[in-house]
Amino acid sequence: MKIKEKKVLVFGSGISGEAACSLLLREGAEVVLYDGNDKLDREEILSKIPESGNGSLQILLGTLADEKKAQLLKTLDLVVMSPGVPTDLPIVNEMRDRGIPIWGEIELAYEAGKGEVL
């Protein structure tokens, strides 16, 4: 899957999520970083994600209102789950039901690292 210009939700803002955001931004994706913890500091998160590439970044923290969640899920091309995020959350089940591909960090690195075969 080409990542450029895809809308990708990175679920979890820990070290893995920050690294995923950096890679996706470098590849030109439209990135939404989501973490259910509303006590996190948005500026601190931003300071850990280097700005590079042609991608864009939006950060969502805390519980998503149903309308916001539905709007977001309609527009996603891909979800990258951080390893610490439980895979049985209702929103994750909803993503599966909608057929949105859900990758881990290893799948993302594999796809991004693919080169052209000569």
Predicted regions and their residues:
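N-terminal leader/targeting and accessory segments in enzymes
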Residues: 1-104, 108
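Walker A (P-loop) phosphate-binding motif
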Residues: 105-118
